[in-house]
Amino acid sequence: MAEITVGQLAQQTNKEVDALLKQLKSFGIEKSSEKDTLTPTEMKTLLEKINSAKNTATRKKVTSVKLDGKHKINVSVKRKRRVAKKMEQQESTTLEQPQELETMVQEVSQQVDIVKEQDNIEQIVENKEAVKVQEQRQAEIAKPVIKDSGFKITAMPEIKIEEIVAEDDEGLAASDKQAKKKAAKKVFSEAVNTNTKYKREEEEKKSKAKKAGGKGFKKANPRQLSQLAGDLESFDEFGAKKGKLKAPKVKKQEFTKPVENTVRTVEIYEGITVSELAQKMAVKGAEIVKVLFNMGVMATINQSLDQDTAILIVEEMGHKYTLHNENALEEAVTIVDRSSYKKISRAPVVTIMGHVDHGKTSLLDYIRQTRVVAGEAGGITQHIGAYSVKTDKGSITFLDTPGHEAFTSMRARGAKSTDIVILVVAADDGVMPQTEEAIQHAKAARVPIVVAVNKIDKPEADSDKVISELAQRNVIPESWGGDVMFVNVSAKTGEGVADLLEAVLLQSEVLELEAFAEGLAEGVVIESRLEKGRGPVATVLVQNGNLKQGDNILCGTEYGRVRAMHNDLGKKIKAAGPATPVEILGLSGVPAAGDEMVVIENEKKAKELAAQRSQKQKEAKIAQEQSLKLSNMFNNMGKEGEQQVLKIILKGDVQGSVEAIRESLLKLSTDEVKVDIIASGIGAITSSDVTLAVASTAVVIGFNVRADSAAKKLAETDGVEFRYYNIIYDLIDDVKKAMSGLLSPEMKEQIIGIAEVREVYRSSKFGSIAGCMVIEGVVKRTNPIRVLRNNVVIYEGTLESLKRFKDDASEVKKGLECGIGVKNYNDVREGDQIEVFEVIEVAKEL
């Protein structure tokens, strides 16, 4: 017998190496690893031990076979091997054992394949004939027999099939083999019949479900079979039910696959809110608020952000950005291609500026030969007038601006839309504050100046004084080597007016003013108002192109179709060229003075662009209010008391006047009293204005307008007072007085008398009594006092007693002696002064 290793023996006997080593050790054969060899003597000893102990080795193998539907079967194969041989046949049996085991495994695998072909087995079948054969074989001891107790098949639900298949062996008789084959055939024929019956029942159930309108049976998801395996089987090993079937449990996924961060491209536009930015980046708004907080900005999810802040947030969170061009629509609509048109020379647009009452409108009146000043309240121009004047040498368009300081913005607007500025300075007054402002506006707009020294006909006129004062402000005349023309004029007599017009036309020739006379018109809104029966009326100065009746126009946030046009004389016209002032009707609302006017071919685009501009204005207003709230929060820290507010509802005749008054009133606000214009508009005072005034306790002010009948009745019922004004001086002065009335009175101390201590007496009742002489004013018994020593206050209190000789006195006048007892103070010395004062209320003024 050749030597064999432990590993080879374990492989032949289908045993684990460790288990075989333990078994060898129990038999007294010491081996430590699978590479150790077994000698023939050790092999003989091993076989003797096995035969003497009649050792039995049992192995079990479980396999799973899937069936259709929701079921599967478990096939359990058990092998028992008992060796009972005669001593002389042990060696040969041991050598043949691996071959017998291999044959047995092949037979079992064939049987398992047959079982896998069966879809379902629901009952236990026992092979009685195989058991009888087994008993016969156990009785035969003479021949070595390796018995296989067979395999057991466990199906779901808990259906078991046990069958015993005997292994082929050289010592088995032919009758035993035939009996074994018959038993195996019988077992599997019964299994096939059972499976066929089960399939027939399943088909009947499916057909019934289809007839009943049901969906029938669904094929089970392979992923669900493992979940259902433990829940569907509720039978014991004898086939009895243990309980009701449980519903399949939904198992939670224990591991979430990590997702790679997505880098998004965010489109950022001006005024984007925190919530919109969060939505574009697919994050929560709270995360962006945290980022802003870390950047030192306190914000809410509805707050608007500027583009720079939004860019920082997007970069901080690891995304990319693109800037949204908000002006794309505006550029596409408003930019007009005029390359195919020719330019022509146009009339100059001249703005007359100067101080109030220096004769601007009178000069223009003389030029136009009309009495415009007679129609102005108080002789003061309240809003811009646009006029076109034809002279022998050409046409000139004049813009007359107010001279009052309240109309600074209107003067600036006139300077922006003008070519030449005529600066009117009175020869008797010289340079005044509004004159300096007019110079600043003209220089800021880089507009050439022509100085008209007016009122030259007066005896006190001094033109040299005017020239020297203007030279100090860098307005150098040509006679001094500068570039500014000075013309002495008189609006009353007409002296020098022709020379002034000639100087203006000469300056316009130097400028070479040109414009396009064809194409879509462009211009600027000079003034706007709301007229009863006509609607919104806008005074427009055409700068380029040809404005025609019926054109679709866009003025700021208002749009419409030109229904009618009137020139400066009130006549209807069909078209207007460059440098022509016209009044137009047909806008959707009253535009703001200074807005650009453009003609757009498509009315739909004009409406869309107007809505976009309106939205921009709202967002800008909200952003400004937010910044003001933040600044006010820090400015009001530590301030005591509440700020008084004077609420005003302002109505005017024209847009420019309302705007100027609004700015002037807002400038009156102080830390203690604030002017709040809660509503302003153009046109008559209506009942809605009265209702708003009642709700907000506001004052209603009308400038060159009156209340309608419905508003008057409602005002009488609710007790609302209207204040009408025609001159802006009176309006501002009255508002100042009203604001002063809201101021809390100021408390001031006033010294009413001083008494000098000449001698000190002692009294058992009052303590120290000062004998005094009143040297100033009067000393009163009830007023507070201060004790001064060397002009330093050492005590402040009240008088306990005041006597003249032995009698009590309520007051002692200057030059008289008296006795004064100071309450709770006895350290009065000779030479001290007792100062008597009183606290009075003084009304504050702005």
Curated annotation (Swiss-Prot):
Q: Where is this region: Disordered?
A: 199-219
Instruction: Note the PROSITE patterns from the entry.
Output: G_TR_2 (PS51722), IF2 (PS01176)
Compartments (UniProt record): Cytoplasm
**Region annotation G1: residue ranges?**
354-361
Where are the residues of the annotated region G3? 400-403
Q: Where is this region: G4?
A: 454-457
Question: Where are the annotated segments for G5?
Answer: 490-492
| Location, primary (coarse class) | cytoplasm
Chain spans, region G2 = 379-383
Keywords carried by this UniProt record: Cytoplasm, GTP-binding, Initiation factor, Nucleotide-binding, Protein biosynthesis
The record places domain tr-type G at: 345-512
Q: Which domain of life is it from?
A: Bacteria
| Gene3D superfamilies per UniProt | P-loop containing nucleotide triphosphate hydrolases, Putative DNA-binding domain, N-terminal subdomain of bacterial translation initiation factor IF2, Translation factors, Translation initiation factor IF- 2, domain 3
Q: Name one GO molecular function term.
A: GTPase activity
Query: Which amino acid positions bind GTP, per UniProt?
Result: 354-361, 400-404, 454-457
Q: Locations of Basic residues compositional bias?
A: 207-219
> Cellular component per GO?
cytosol
Q: What does this protein do?
A: One of the essential components for the initiation of protein synthesis. Protects formylmethionyl-tRNA from spontaneous hydrolysis and promotes its binding to the 30S ribosomal subunits. Also involved in the hydrolysis of GTP during the formation of the 70S ribosomal complex.
Q: Its family?
A: Belongs to the TRAFAC class translation factor GTPase superfamily. Classic translation factor GTPase family. IF-2 subfamily.
Q: Which HAMAP family match?
A: IF_2_B
UniProt protein name:
Translation initiation factor IF-2
